[in-house]
Regions:
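Intrinsic low-complexity, intrinsically disordered segments enriched in polar/basic residues
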Residues: 1-10, 16, 118, 151-152
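Helix-boundary and loop/linker segments of multi-pass membrane transporters
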Residues: 2-7, 40-48, 77-79, 121-123
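Generic preference for well-ordered secondary structure
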Residues: 3, 11, 15, 45-49, ...
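N-terminal signal-anchor transmembrane alpha helix
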Residues: 8-33
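Transmembrane helix-loop-helix hairpins at the membrane interface
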Residues: 21-22, 26-29, 52-152
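Membrane-interface helix-loop junction between the first two transmembrane segments
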Residues: 31-43
């Protein structure tokens, strides 16, 4: 599985991993919508330039920083990459659910991808691990914004 390997270029890894994170969340969104319908009271998607920058740059930077701290803490108890990523993703799912209940469900898999990426690339250096996870997260959020804009 490419997520566990550092054999390809960082750019290729980021593009592939962001596609995996986006498609996994998107597939779950479509399934939930088809089976149950998404609620009309979803999050407000009206965006200013500041909102876009916050969604694509600031939010991912802050969340990735917090994620790295949580993963470093979890690493004190286990060295299992997927377990650590899933525990961390669960924490972020709960946090996102506080904003809107369904967000937590839709953010779990992307945060597993971000968490795995950080841990794999952290073996090069913590800075590289952070940068890769941040870029994947920023790309993921960019795709979400683009799809949201196309859907309006």
């Amino acid at each position: 599985m490419f997520l566990l390997s550092r054999k390809e270029s960082k750019l290729s890894y980021c593009l592939k991993a962001s596609a995996v994170s986006f498609c996994s969340a998107g597939a779950l969104t479509v399934i939930v919508d088809l089976l149950y319908g998404l609620p009309a009271d979803g999050p407000d998607v009206g965006m200013t330039l500041v909102d876009v920058l916050g969604t694509v740059l600031v939010g991912p930077a802050l969340e990735t920083l917090l994620m790295t701290l949580i993963l470093v803490l979890i690493a004190k108890f286990t060295d299992r990459i997927f377990l650590s990523a899933c525990l961390c993703a669960f924490i972020f799912s709960v946090l996102h659910s506080m904003s809107h209940p369904l967000w937590g469900m839709f953010t779990f898999m992307p945060f597993v991808v971000f968490g795995v990426a950080f841990q794999v690339w952290r073996q090069s250096s913590p800075k590289v691990g952070f940068t890769i996870a941040f870029l994947i997260h920023a790309l993921h959020n960019s795709y979400v914004l683009l799809v949201g804009m196309l859907g309006q």
